[in-house]
Each structure stands twice: as C-alpha cells, then as structure tokens.
Amino acid sequence: MDEVKKLTIKDIRRMYEEKEPMSWISIYDYPMAYYADQAGIDVIFVGDSSTTTVLGYPNTLYASMDQMIMFAEAVTRAVKHAFVIGDLPYRSYQASVM
C-alpha cells in the first residue's frame, strides 16, 4: 500500500502558486473527517460555525476556545493526508478593546 503524504503549508502554497486545484471542506467531527480524508480532500476547515451546526446555538458568538480545540482535535485525529485549519472564536485574537 502506498504511504499517504501529509499535506503541509508549503504544499498548499505550492498548489496555490501552480494553480493546482484544491478541495476544501468544513468538518467538525472524527467520522466525517475520516471519510473526507479517505476521499482525498486536501484541506479541512474546522470553523466556529460548529457552534450553530453541531451545538445548536443561534450564532457563532457562543464559540469558546475549548470548544474549538475539541472540534479541531477530533478532526486531526482522523486525518492522515488533509491539511487542517482551526478557526479561532470571535474576539479570541483581539489584543485590546478600543
């Protein structure tokens, strides 16, 4: 069986620069990430929209860092090829409140 190569940010950059088609999808759990990876998806985005689509909140403002880490960990445990991007919750990256 061929060894599966894990995509890196350098691979994504090269694919972009060479205009090579890439497949992206938003996924929040282990089973879906496993099947997406098996299907050859290149990039899996773990978005804060998981709070609305999975947890049933009315908007993404309810996303916490702990929740986003939990979703990202579940996805990364499932994949061997895809590059995983984890979203940050709203305002978790803001340095000040001007």
Where are these regions (language model features)?
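Conserved, mostly hydrophobic/aromatic
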Residues: 25, 29, 36, 75
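Short coil/turn connectors at secondary-structure junctions
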Residues: 19-22, 39-42, 79-82
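N-terminal amphipathic alpha-helix/helix-capping segment at the start of soluble metabolic enzymes
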Residues: 1-26
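Intrinsic-disorder/low-complexity, polar/charged segments
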Residues: 8, 95-96
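Hydrophobic faces of well-ordered beta-strands that scaffold small-molecule active sites
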Residues: 23-27, 44-46, 84-88
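Glycine-rich, proline-tolerant flexible connector loops at the mouths of alpha/beta enzymes
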Residues: 32-33, 39, 43-69, 88-95
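Alpha-helix-loop-beta-strand connector modules within alpha/beta enzyme cores
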Residues: 2, 6-10, 57-90
